């Protein structure tokens, strides 16, 4: 099994966003703008990134 990772950076604020989007950011390990988090590249993580795609950016 390969140990692929994905790094995401928060570029948007969760202020005035639905609670589930804020909770998704916390699940990704993000809480403030311009913070980065490195996670395992799994379908669950990819789904979370897709849910808040307007608030995060994938760093390659």
Swiss-Prot record:
Pfam families per the UniProt record, alphabetical: Ribosomal_L30 (PF00327)
One GO-annotated biological process of the protein: translation
Q: Name one GO cellular component term.
A: cytosolic large ribosomal subunit
Q: Which domain of life is it from?
A: Bacteria
Membrane-spanning residues where? none
Give the GO molecular function terms. structural constituent of ribosome
Per UniProt, which keywords does this protein have?
Ribonucleoprotein, Ribosomal protein
Protein's UniProt name = Large ribosomal subunit protein uL30
- Reply yes or no: does the keyword Ribosomal protein apply: yes
Which PANTHER family does this one have?
A: LARGE RIBOSOMAL SUBUNIT PROTEIN UL30M (PTHR15892:SF2), MITOCHONDRIAL RIBOSOMAL PROTEIN L30 (PTHR15892)
Q: Could you say which protein family the record assigns here?
A: Belongs to the universal ribosomal protein uL30 family.
């Amino acid at each position: 099994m390969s140990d692929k990772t994905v790094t995401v950076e928060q570029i948007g604020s969760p202020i005035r966003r639905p609670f589930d989007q804020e909770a998704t950011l916390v699940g990704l390990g993000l809480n403030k703008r311009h913070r980065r988090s490195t996670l395992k590249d799994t379908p669950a993580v990819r789904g979370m990134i897709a849910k808040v795609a307007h608030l995060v950016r994938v760093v390659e």
